[in-house]
From Swiss-Prot:
Assigned protein family: Belongs to the UPF0173 family.
Name of the protein: UPF0173 metal-dependent hydrolase Dshi_2788
Originating species: Dinoroseobacter shibae (strain DSM 16493 / NCIMB 14021 / DFL 12)
GO molecular function per UniProt: hydrolase activity
Hydrolase listed as a keyword: yes
Length: 230
């Protein structure tokens, strides 16, 4: 399995027979290196979207058309894009599982908000979510934008994820300390990767509080477009 952080909440995950782009934000992303665009997108099979905010969806439709990769996410938003943009989508809901080749993706709860920006203000975009991605005999939890929640214990009971990708930059999501609390209280992760930080001055610039809060856990803090092999 290969996991590449594309900056902010965006990831490329190569798992089993799939190359998944998670919330790919390239256009306007201040930390994404434009000269690595081709490497980030090469061979993508599906685009997974956790919620509707622009820093997670800005490129989704255009990339789907460019790459021929279906967009996977909450039913409401997928239905809207299928109808208005003519893109192929896979819509499902929390608790549901879809098979993407040899990879099982289960949608789980998140605590955030979800909307698309319009000329008339925010437009409802379905509920916010996270994903459990299972392949190669392992499970990755992608939290999406969220705070700590007691649901996480249920997620661990049902899915036993070994790898946690946690939004932890604060202000819009849980911060590093809260993410550490979530990981050590509700999960049994072997590896944790923080995200949704260092993008703007408003967000956390260091993952050190997460590292300090998870002694004995392998906390990885890759640079943008650095690939971790697990």
């Amino acid at each position: 399995m290969k996991i590449t952080w594309m900056g902010h909440g965006s990831f490329r995950i190569e798992i089993a027979d799939q190359v998944l782009l998670i919330d790919p934000w390239i256009t306007g992303n201040p930390v994404f290196p434009a000269d690595r665009r081709d490497a980030a997108l090469a061979g993508a099979t599906h685009i997974l979207i956790t919620h509707g905010h622009g820093d997670h969806t800005a490129d989704a439709v255009a990339l789907s058309k460019e790459l021929g990769a279906p967009i996977v996410g909450i039913y409401d938003l997928m239905s809207y894009w299928a109808e208005t943009e003519g893109v192929e989508t896979v819509g499902f809901n929390k608790g549901g599982t879809v098979m993407l080749g040899d990879v099982a993706v289960t949608m789980v709860n998140a605590v955030h908000s979800s909307s698309l920006g319009t000329d008339h203000g925010p437009m409802y975009a379905g509920a916010e979510a996270g994903f459990m991605i299972k392949g190669e005999g392992r499970t990755v939890y992608v939290s999406g934008d969220t705070d700590v929640m007691a649901d996480m214990k249920v997620f661990n009971d049902l899915h036993q994820p070994e790898i946690g990708i946690l939004a932890s930059g604060g202000h819009f999501t849980m911060d590093m300390e809260r993410a550490a609390y979530a990981a050590r209280t509700f999960f049994d992760f072997k590896t944790v990767i923080p995200c949704h930080y260092k993008t703007f001055p408003l967000l956390a610039q260091s993952a050190q509080p997460l590292i300090d809060g998870l002694p004995g856990t392998d906390v990885r803090t890759p640079e943008v477009m650095e690939t971790i092999e697990l």
